[in-house]
UniProtKB/Swiss-Prot annotation:
It is an enzyme of class 7 (translocase). GO terms for biological process: ATP biosynthetic process; proton transmembrane transport. It comes from Bryopsis maxima. GO terms for cellular component: chloroplast thylakoid membrane; proton-transporting ATP synthase complex. F-type ATPases have 2 components, CF(1) - the catalytic core - and CF(0) - the membrane proton channel. CF(1) has five subunits: alpha(3), beta(3), gamma(1), delta(1), epsilon(1). CF(0) has four main subunits: a, b, b' and c. Disulfide bonds: none annotated. This is ATP synthase subunit alpha, chloroplastic. Coiled coil: none annotated.
Amino acid sequence: DIIMSTNTFSEEAEALLKEALETYLKEFA
């Protein structure tokens, strides 16, 4: 369970980072 939770967290975190990066580029690029 811990491994699955960690994996899910990593995938969600990666998605959030990508979304944040795209938003940053749109705002400041």
